């Protein structure tokens, strides 16, 4: 979640830490950060969750987010938690955030009335949407 060797660039966590630490000196005019896209940011966090689990539980290493922290969505919940915590750190120094997410229309039929209606959905987990 921190560093991309291919592009030689810092990641989301390093960026947030830098802004929080140096807001008044390096980023005095920074007001808003745009996250494009939230679903991708959560995907980026998943390997970090696996790393965290394996560091805390060396006797029971996992390779999958679904197995991390005991399973039953605990790994996915941890990914969401660390992303949101970083976003709230930005907010704590006065930097707001705009989150972009991909949505798509889905046509459904009401089982009771038989009427067709359209709803918005996403590729993300409904827990995050």
What are these regions (language model features)?
Residues 41-42:
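Catalytic P-loop NTPase motifs of RecA-like helicase/translocase cores
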Residues 1-32:
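Basic, amphipathic N-terminal segments that precede the first structured/catalytic domain
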Residues 27-32, 93-99:
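Loop/turn-to-beta-strand initiation segments
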Residues 45-78:
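A solvent-exposed, charged loop/short amphipathic helix patch at secondary-structure junctions
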Residues 10-18, 73-84, 119-129:
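Well-ordered, non-membrane alpha-helical segments in soluble/globular domains
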Residues 37:
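Walker B catalytic acidic pair
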Residues 96-129:
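Phosphate-binding/switch region of NTP-binding enzymes
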Residues 82-93:
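Catalytic-core regions built around general acid/base machinery
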């Amino acid at each position: 979640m921190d560093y991309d060797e291919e592009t030689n660039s810092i990641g989301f966590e390093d960026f947030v830490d830098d802004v929080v630490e140096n807001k008044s000196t390096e980023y005095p005019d920074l007001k808003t950060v745009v996250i494009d896209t939230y679903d991708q940011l959560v995907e980026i966090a998943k390997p970090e969750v696996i790393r965290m689990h394996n560091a805390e539980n060396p006797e029971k290493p996992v390779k999958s987010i679904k197995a991390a922290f005991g399973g039953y969505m605990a790994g996915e919940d941890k990914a969401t938690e660390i992303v949101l915590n970083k976003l709230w750190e930005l907010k704590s120094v006065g930097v707001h955030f705009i989150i972009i997410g991909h949505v798509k229309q889905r046509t459904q039929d009401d089982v009771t009335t038989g009427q067709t209606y359209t709803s918005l959905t996403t590729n993300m987990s409904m827990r995050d949407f």
